[in-house]
């Protein structure tokens, strides 16, 4: 009898955890849509998408979404690295109550993104300089 009670509590926590995860993912989707990105939550538990991302819609970015008060960021980053495809940057989008969303990613991925940003800014500067001649 005690076993059934413990099993029921564990199952309840598991379902509650999935519901909280879904809620956080939907919240992140709404936030990304505010920025103009057509993002959506994946059905990662159905097994029919073939995707491990929690949220899709940002090309080349693997999104691991965590909406928790206490986050083990090292474990979350390792999960993102493990689940991301070779052509995607592993990222963890995370938020606590009454705080802004944050994005954490490995430094080498950030450097690659920054190099692309820097190159595009320099190209725009050259184009603007050429137009003003």
Outline where the language-model segments fall:
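Catalytic phosphate/metal-binding cores of nucleic-acid and nucleotide-processing enzymes, i.e., regions
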Residues: 1-133
């Amino acid at each position: 009898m005690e076993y059934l009670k413990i099993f029921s509590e564990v199952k309840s926590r598991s379902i509650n955890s999935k519901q909280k995860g879904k809620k956080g993912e939907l919240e992140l989707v709404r936030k990304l849509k505010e920025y103009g990105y057509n993002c959506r939550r994946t059905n990662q538990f159905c097994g029919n998408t073939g995707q491990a991302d929690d949220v899709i819609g940002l090309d080349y970015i693997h999104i691991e979404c965590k909406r928790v008060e206490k986050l083990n960021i090292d474990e979350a980053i390792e999960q993102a690295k493990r689940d991301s495809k070779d052509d995607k940057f592993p990222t963890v989008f995370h938020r606590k109550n009454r705080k802004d969303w944050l994005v954490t990613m490995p430094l080498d991925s950030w450097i690659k993104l920054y190099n692309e940003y820097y190159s595009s800014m320099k190209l725009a500067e050259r184009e603007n300089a050429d137009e003003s001649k």
